[in-house]
Amino acid sequence: MGWTAVSGAGLSWADAPETNAVSTQLTIPYVPTRQDVVRDLFWLADVGTNDVLYDLGSGDGGIVIAAVRDCGARKAVGIEIDPQRIRESREKAKEAGVTDRVEFIQGDLFTNDFSQASVVVLYLGQRANLDLRAKLVRTLRPGARIVTHQFGMGEWPPDKELTVRTPYLGMFGREANQFAGNPNVPDYEAGRNLATTSTLSMWIVPAPLAGIWRGDVSMPGGKRELKLALHQRLTGLYGSFQLRGATNVEGWVSADLWGNHLRFEGRLTDRPYFEFGIMFDGHIRENTMRGKLAVLERSQIREDQWESRRDKADFTGTWEWNGPVGARPVHLKIEKRDGTWLGDYLDRGWNSRAANGLETTVRDFYDFGGGFYFTFLIGRERNKGGLGYGILVDENAGWLTGEAIAESNGVKGTVSFYPYSERPKKDIVVQQGSQPWSPRRVTP
């Protein structure tokens, strides 16, 4: 099934086969974003003179034109599939006198390049956002901002959020009636979106942080190696540290990532805070981490510049682990195709619907340097062994998610399953069914 957006200064998308996607999408109602909401979107993303803004599904071009006219953006680009909207956008840009700094591209936002964007605006719908987010994270530079109107990014919580309420006569008849009950907008919650409330959200594209990092630390007895094992679920981070020496010191790490700006703290699990701790504030550039490291030991703090390097990682190949029912093995094949990391989920033992079992491409896959993260939607079927993964996507459908880092010629992380209905919620912290995950590589 293919997804393509039509109107980003408004909203439209369709779950339609790509062969007839254009004709289907052109029948979806176009609703422009209110000007007060546009201003708040720009404020939330802090759009300024150095920014290049892309509106994916740009409609009549209102957001694109306003970005350069009102915020002084260096450039703004709209991608829109409807040729009539493209013509309207170009006429409006000419009237506004901004044709030298705007561009309107007729095409599919899933295939067009937007890698130069520092700000991306979306008004597409929950499912379209989920289909698009892997490309956003893969394509945009760390620190780029993604802003959305009304719809979220699943289990990826926003970095900032704003609720806008504005008196607007006629809102009930014009907007709500067109979206409510529209099969092309199944995630539109009519009760929540009535009246004049808009929810605006922003995400900062994270740098690829996952992996094993090593660097020397100057201590009273000489230099000691500090090893970090950092796991990454988009902007969700966790890990551990080991300070090696005559006696190794080990503990857990909590971290916060803002683009390529990283802060982390390390604590011991069995000793008081004032006895030992580490704190870091710095930046990531490819496979190098640089910044200021503070070491707290027996109430004494030492600060110094610190640099660490990430271990090389190779997680290509087919990985095997026991499925959710009994000891039946399932597989995840990870490979790079046309420059993009993808996975194939294989369950040869599941055969109630297909002779070859379940096989599906995992497109929501993220290469985070020394580790990876993935999610995909699967069904559930009941059998004598309990609940197993199946191909039916029904009321029992859910998301299989996994993350791991390359370590000791293998990978180590967690794998989780949780119901489909829970993914849009923003308060999910611990996913249901999460368990340690150390799959075996069965083919290189």
Label every PLM stretch briefly.
Residues 207-408, 412-423, 427-443:
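Central antiparallel beta-sheet cores of small beta-barrel/beta-sandwich binding domains
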Residues 115-131:
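A short SAM/SAH-binding and catalytic strip from SAM-dependent methyltransferases
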Residues 61-65:
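Glycine-rich SAM-binding Motif I of class I
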Residues 129-208:
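C-terminal substrate-binding/active-site "lid" region of AdoMet-derived donor-dependent transferases
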Residues 75-80:
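Conserved SAM-binding motif I beta-strand of class I
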Residues 50-59:
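Conserved class I S-adenosyl-L-methionine
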Residues 11-51, 86-116:
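S-adenosyl-L-methionine
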